[in-house]
Design a protein with these regions (language model features):
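Short linear motifs in intrinsically disordered
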Residues: 40-44, 59-66, 105-112
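N-terminal "first-domain core" detector
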Residues: 4-53
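Generic recognition of long tandem-repeat/solenoid scaffolds
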Residues: 43-55, 73-76, 117-122
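Short intrinsically disordered terminal tails
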Residues: 1-4, 174
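Amphipathic protein-protein interaction modules
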Residues: 86-142
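Surface-exposed polar/charged interaction patches
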Residues: 26-33, 37, 102, 126-128, ...
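Intrinsically disordered, low-complexity regulatory segments enriched in Ser/Thr/Pro
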Residues: 55-91, 132-174
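Alpha-helix boundary/N-cap detector
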Residues: 10-14, 18, 83, 87, ...
Length: 174
């Protein structure tokens, strides 16, 4: 007996077959291959887990989606993690759609030539973007951001279409 006001959105997704169908439909305009852990490249996955590789028509920067006990999206150096629940699945679909449409890119920070981390930046960044403001909007974790703005380094943006990729040098503040 379900109370009428039960919020269906927080329901666990019990098995991923409906999700797989829904996702394949959402990705129907893309070149997608489906993989299981019976393949050597995917033998780290659990039984029953499925991986979708969305082929990038421009280069080898493919997008990887893994569906298992939780859902994962990999693009460039970014790894997005989503719980296997409806509202998080919807968030994942929005993120994937934004990447494929070029409306989101992977923002990576480097200081001293070392990678400090990556995040998904939900915007198309212009070549003359204000880096401090961009990092305010897109970078949640304080520490590497402060270090970058103080010591200098670089910000890389990776998009589905490599023609949109950007690299910004940040001069040290001394």
């Amino acid at each position: 007996e379900h109370p009428m006001n039960a919020n269906i959105n927080y329901d666990e997704i019990p098995d991923t077959s409906a999700v797989q169908e829904d996702l394949l439909a959402a990705l129907s305009s893309q070149h997608v291959t489906v993989h299981t852990n019976e393949e050597p490249d995917f033998d780290y996955m659990e039984n029953g887990d499925v991986a979708f590789v969305v082929k990038n028509p421009h280069n080898d920067e493919n997008l990887l989606i893994e569906l298992g006990g939780e859902f994962s999206v990999f693009f460039g150096l970014w790894h997005g993690q989503y719980k296997a629940v409806e509202y998080d699945y919807d968030r994942m679909k929005k993120d994937v759609a934004a990447i494929l449409a070029g409306n989101a890119g992977v923002l990576s920070l480097y200081t001293d030539g070392k990678w400090q981390g990556s995040t998904l930046c939900p915007e198309k960044v212009s070549a003359d973007a204000d880096m401090e403001k961009l990092l305010e909007r897109c970078w949640q974790k304080q520490e590497p951001k402060e270090k970058l703005l103080a010591q200098g380094g670089r910000v890389e943006l990776l998009y589905w279409d490599p023609a949109e990729n950007k690299s910004f040098m940040i001069p040290a503040k001394n």
